[in-house]
Amino acid sequence: MRMALGVSYNGQAYNGWQSQPSGNTVQDRLEAALGRFATQEVHTICAGRTDAGVHGLMQVVHFDTQLQRAPFSWVRGTNTFLPTDIAVQWAQPVPDAFHSRACAVARRYAYVLLQSPVRPSVDAGRVGWVFHALDEQAMHRAVQHLLGEHDFTSFRASACQAKSPVKTLHRIDITRRAPPAGESTGTHGCIPCYWRFEFEGNAFLHHMIRNIMGCIVAIGQGLYPPEWMRTVLEARSRDAAAPTFSPDGLYFQGPVYGAEWGLPTRTAAYDWLP
């Protein structure tokens, strides 16, 4: 029997998703918990790997098992053995043809950024941070150059193992959540607010979103014009782009599957993001 799980996690304490000899990864913790519940070794395959410090709202994994249990028994039983910063949100039996990675038609990420003269405190590690005001129109114009199919070599980490740097970005949305009028505590021309950058594409390269974010923020701060984004893209060189941005505010929102699989499309964790 093949099972699919939706998993959410705070990535601050882990060395990314993928299993490592240290054992301090989300995959290692999940498989250990599944093994204890199932009393047998369980190997999972995920929809998309995340780096150290990156969070997951709805990672999807699949695995094969001989254990017959109700779907919610998998949820409660596995969560019993998981640390508090990792939780299985749902479980569902799927056909043997389902593959969490190969069946995904797209993947979604969000980056949450705090704009404030004061560094984050209660949300430290869960948001990125800038202390300069950002130009929304400039950032919006800049990301238009990235939509569609392109060679994203300029935004690719040197350790990336992808066979091709050509990917397709379907959507990049930028939204700003500001405090109510009259309640701003901004200083030095920087009004505190949260920015949310949402990305949807067929697939992503290693560090691709964090490298794009570095360029978006540089343009938002006025260091470069919006057209610089196209210059960086066409250079096809990592040296042409801005430094890699912090992993703190990056969230893997999850994969997108066809309706024929009947899998959940979101979890409650989506609703608390700014």
Curated annotation (Swiss-Prot):
Chain residues that bind substrate: 109
EC number: 5.4.99.12
Keyword Nucleotide-binding annotated: no
GO molecular function, one term: RNA binding
Keyword field contains Iron: no
Any GO BP annotation: tRNA pseudouridine synthesis
Active site: 51
InterPro entries on file: PsdUridine_synth_cat_dom_sf, PsdUridine_synth_TruA, PsdUridine_synth_TruA_a/b_dom, PsdUridine_synth_TruA_C, TruA/RsuA/RluB/E/F_N
UniProtKB keywords: Isomerase, tRNA processing
Top-level taxon: Bacteria
SUPFAM superfamilies membership: Pseudouridine synthase (SSF55120)
Substrates-to-products reaction catalysed: uridine(38/39/40) in tRNA = pseudouridine(38/39/40) in tRNA
Pfam family of the protein (one): PseudoU_synth_1
Quaternary state and interactors: Homodimer.
Family note: Belongs to the tRNA pseudouridine synthase TruA family.
Role: Formation of pseudouridine at positions 38, 39 and 40 in the anticodon stem and loop of transfer RNAs.
Record protein name field: tRNA pseudouridine synthase A
Gene symbol of the encoding locus: truA
